[in-house]
Amino acid sequence: NFHIITMLRNLKVPHKSSEIFSVILPIFKVSMNLAHIKCLSMLLGALCAVQTVCLSKLAGAFDSKASRESCFRRIQRFMSQMVLDLDAVAGYLKSRIPSDGPYTLTMDRTNWKFGEVNINALVLGIAYDHMSFPILFRLLPKRGNSNCKERINIMQRFIRLFGRDSIKCLVADREFVGNEWFKWLNDNAIQYHIRIRDNFWVEDPRTNRNIRAQHIFANLKHGEERVLYRIYRICGELCYLSGAVIKDKTGKPEPQILVSFCRPEEALPAYKERWTIETMFKVLKSSGFNIEDTHMVHINRIEQLFGVVIIAYTWA
């Protein structure tokens, strides 16, 4: 992937901690002391240099004349004492986007496992220039899918920080469906384009007839698209439908069916932005920062580390 390769090349450019310090000082000076901000700036520079969360490797890349062992202990103390203001992190991340919006938001979830500990992150990003900036995230203390309350909470937090008018639309994959979720989006007039499973039941409110979504687009061939301007009822909510036939990961044709609050003609082009969040996950994980290397098991500390890695990701 061209965009992953470009980002990884940028990450390898050395970043002086003094330069990083001058940028992050105004953002964190209210919630962190100067010693912690300085340590954070050196940690960010080391992350960009070695692209791993392995503390011993980060200590070796610290912008400090102290010994590697001393730097290692300093990082350990910092990670145990640090309380990262995640609202401030979100404001900083948004400031890195050279656009005032409104934005296409991408919602997705990523997970990994260390020993018996399941680490499960719900992430809300802003799609811009073939990238997704991970503005907000929450580590879920469980395995499996997010629920409606967790999705609503992260959306409400975005609205509290940046306003509803900053949202152009939300795009998300098949996990992010449900009656209560669609109702909340509709009630708040948030434009969305969300993929549904092919076997979803769709009701035509004019006839009260139920039909599987895949049957509506059954005669489409690979590369063809269709936008339906009739309103349907899905998960109890009135929505629009659009569809296309794409190739899955194995190269086999499959339907891609989207449900929208309004403007269904924008659904298929907008949904292509969803792939930016998957690219971002690759950079955070095995293709870039190797966040899966963390040996932390306490969810609060992992959440803090996740925030630090996300800052380093956007610094590039």
Residue ranges of predicted features:
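Active-site-proximal, Lys/Arg-enriched surface segment
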Residues: 68, 72-130
